[in-house]
């Protein structure tokens, strides 16, 4: 009989959990805190064209590296891998806080995203190593509560810091919290023995999807650059933009071939994306996640530039989006538990999201507060209704051994779609702003308007201001069309899924017992690939995995 695992004392476990919660507070805050600070940042750096990069740089690097971090946790002690990630994240926060230019801020966001990829996976793994299994759900629930609360309060915190201190404190805030975390982990967490720690250096390298990453990361970067440059710095038919699109397509095609030829260490398992229900679910997740981020980032810009809201007030004004999602997510989980079918709720979720996105795209300078708040409720209830239920689907439509990998794949594509959607939205915003100004106020140089979001009225003559404000508002509304299109994609995805019944307790037990042996073997393989920690970290630390 195997020896019972030895766990730290309650005091040590509590201190470690507090340290993990503080770190997740910083990472979760970084996802939404900039939403209300960005307009002020664009004023200081005169960088309205970089809005998309402030979010997409963080999200893309986070997404591209999280699988590698998950793998490292199986090879090296979790304590030191986690501390490495925290250190990288803190360095990125420091770079953001002291950044003298927009480019430096984007670089800092990328560095922070690199470290954040380690923190989500590591927090769940460390809890698993330090807390007895019977008490684990409570501690894991604490991680989920932290993410949920911070997701709601992030824009408000960002607005308050921007108005009463400086937008730089959105990043400086992470530094003392990170220092406390490092001390807690160093002195309270013991070093574990990783499952793949016995492998040689060559074997560790061979087990990672380095070849796939070598094509995937440049492929997505070239796609983002093409979307960013097209129609703004260069014409869509310029050789630079065309070349980037072609090279991106080639790199991503090679990445797909690598995934098919080496499925045992694939970043995206081919057998999952060829499953009809999983493919529909991917469309649903990608659409709603990408659409949500467009509104989270551009609605505060509209509120501050057009309605003259302060950063703090705009943070309060977008609370319906955050609160509605949390409430609808809880309600959706209860409804599916009772009805036992998730597909109808995913379809209703998509329909409401499309309706809410369409309503928000109709906002204009004369729109009242009731419309602004009410339209957000429709969107947030739509997206929130399916947030938790989407993560139930893999347990129903996938083999038991594929569930963890499926959840990790969904979270991977979810974050990636948010990054791409923000870049595409930025391109639409810039091109439509230039076009609208040329039509409504041809005598106004678009460069003046593009220098910042909140000083619009300081740079434009009073007699031309109504025309310029109208052009600006129309450009944001047309940017919201990207969100509408993304939500429509989610509708196509949910409508294509079969109506599968969520098994009851007895049925689920029989399924697990019947396939238990295959599940154990497959999960061991997935854990070895770093999928286990990453999948669980998103499902538990991100209970509303749509931010």
Swiss-Prot record:
Residues 503-547 are annotated as: Disordered. The keyword Transport applies. Keywords: Membrane, Transmembrane, Transmembrane helix, Transport. It is found in: Membrane. InterPro entries: MFS, MFS_dom, MFS_trans_sf. MFS-type transporter; part of the gene cluster that mediates the biosynthesis of the unguisins, gamma-aminobutyric acid (GABA)-containing fungal cyclic heptapeptides with the amino acid sequence cyclo-(D-Ala1-D-Val2-L-Phe3-D-Val4-D-Ala5-D-Trp6-GABA7) for unguisin A and cyclo-(D-Ala1-D-Val2-L-Leu3-D-Val4-D-Ala5-D-Trp6-GABA7) for unguisin B. May be involved in the secretion of unguisins. This is MFS-type transporter ungB. It comes from Aspergillus violaceofuscus (strain CBS 115571). The gene is ungB.
């Amino acid at each position: 009989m195997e020896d019972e695992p030895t766990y730290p004392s309650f005091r040590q476990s509590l201190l470690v959990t507090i340290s993990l919660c503080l770190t997740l507070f910083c990472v979760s805050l970084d996802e939404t805190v900039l939403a209300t600070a960005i307009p002020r940042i664009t004023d200081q750096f005169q960088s309205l064209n970089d809005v998309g990069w402030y979010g997409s740089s963080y999200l893309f690097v986070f997404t591209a590296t999280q699988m590698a971090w998950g793998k490292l946790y199986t090879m090296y002690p979790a304590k030191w891998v986690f501390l490495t990630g925290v250190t990288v994240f803190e360095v990125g926060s420091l770079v953001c806080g002291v950044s003298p230019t927009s480019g430096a801020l984007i670089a800092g966001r990328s560095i922070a995203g690199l470290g954040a990829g380690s923190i989500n996976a590591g927090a769940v793994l460390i809890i698993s190593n330090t807390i007895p299994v019977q008490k684990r759900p409570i501690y894991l629930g604490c991680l989920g509560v932290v993410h949920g609360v911070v997701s709601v309060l992030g824009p408000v915190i960002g607005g308050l810091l921007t108005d009463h201190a400086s937008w730089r404190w959105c990043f400086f805030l992470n530094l003392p919290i990170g220092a406390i975390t490092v001390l807690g982990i160093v002195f309270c967490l013991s070093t574990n023995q990783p499952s793949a720690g016995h492998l040689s250096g060559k074997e560790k390298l061979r087990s990672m999807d380095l070849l796939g990453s070598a094509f995937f990361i440049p492929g997505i970067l070239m796609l983002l650059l093409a979307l960013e440059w097209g129609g703004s710095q260069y014409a869509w038919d310029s050789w630079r933009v065309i070349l980037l699109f072609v090279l991106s397509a080639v790199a991503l095609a090679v990445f797909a071939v690598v995934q098919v030829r080496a499925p045992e260490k694939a970043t995206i398992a081919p057998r999952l994306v060829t499953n009809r229900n999983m493919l529909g679910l991917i469309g649903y997740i990608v659409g709603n996640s990408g659409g949500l981020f467009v509104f989270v980032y551009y609605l505060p810009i509209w509120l501050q530039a057009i309605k003259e809201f302060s950063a703090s007030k705009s943070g309060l004004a977008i609370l319906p989006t955050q609160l509605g999602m949390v409430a609808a997510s809880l309600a959706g989980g209860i409804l599916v538990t009772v009805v036992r079918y998730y597909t109808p709720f995913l379809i209703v979720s998509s329909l409401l999201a499309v309706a809410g996105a369409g309503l928000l795209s109709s906002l204009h300078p004369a729109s009242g507060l009731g419309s602004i708040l009410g339209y957000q409720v429709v969107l947030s209830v739509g997206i929130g209704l399916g947030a938790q239920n989407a993560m139930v689907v893999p347990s129903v439509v996938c083999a038991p051994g594929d569930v963890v990998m499926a959840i990790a794949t969904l979270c991977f594509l979810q974050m990636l779609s948010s990054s791409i959607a923000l870049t595409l939205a930025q391109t639409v915003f810039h091109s439509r702003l230039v076009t609208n100004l040329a039509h409504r106020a041809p005598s106004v140089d678009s460069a003046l308007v593009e220098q910042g979001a909140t000083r619009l009225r300081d740079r434009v003559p009073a007699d031309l201001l109504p025309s310029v404000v109208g052009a600006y508002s129309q450009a944001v509304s047309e940017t919201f069309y990207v969100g509408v299109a993304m939500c429509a994609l989610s509708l196509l995805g949910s409508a294509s899924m079969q109506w599968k019944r969520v098994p009851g307790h007895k049925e689920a037990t029989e399924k697990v017992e019947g396939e238990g042996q295959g599940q154990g073997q497959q999960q061991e393989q997935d854990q070895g690939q770093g999928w286990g920690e990453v999948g669980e970290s998103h499902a538990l630390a991100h209970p509303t995995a749509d931010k």
